[in-house]
């Protein structure tokens, strides 16, 4: 999973 302030999208994390 991603850090709580990041969001998952198409298999990676973004801010």
Swiss-Prot record:
UniProt KW keywords: Disulfide bond, Hemostasis impairing toxin, Secreted, Toxin
Source organism, top-level taxon: Eukaryota
GO CC entries: extracellular region
Domain C-type lectin: residue ranges: 1-15
Subcellular location: Secreted
Tissue specificity field: Expressed by the venom gland.
GO molecular function, one term: toxin activity
Disulfide bond entries: 2-13
Function noted in UniProt: Interferes with one step of hemostasis (modulation of platelet aggregation, or coagulation cascade, for example).
Family in the record: Belongs to the snaclec family.
The protein, known as: Snaclec Bfon18
Organism: Bothrops fonsecai
Organism lineage string: Eukaryota, Metazoa, Chordata, Craniata, Vertebrata
């Amino acid at each position: 999973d991603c850090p709580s302030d990041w969001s998952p999208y198409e298999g990676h994390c973004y801010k």
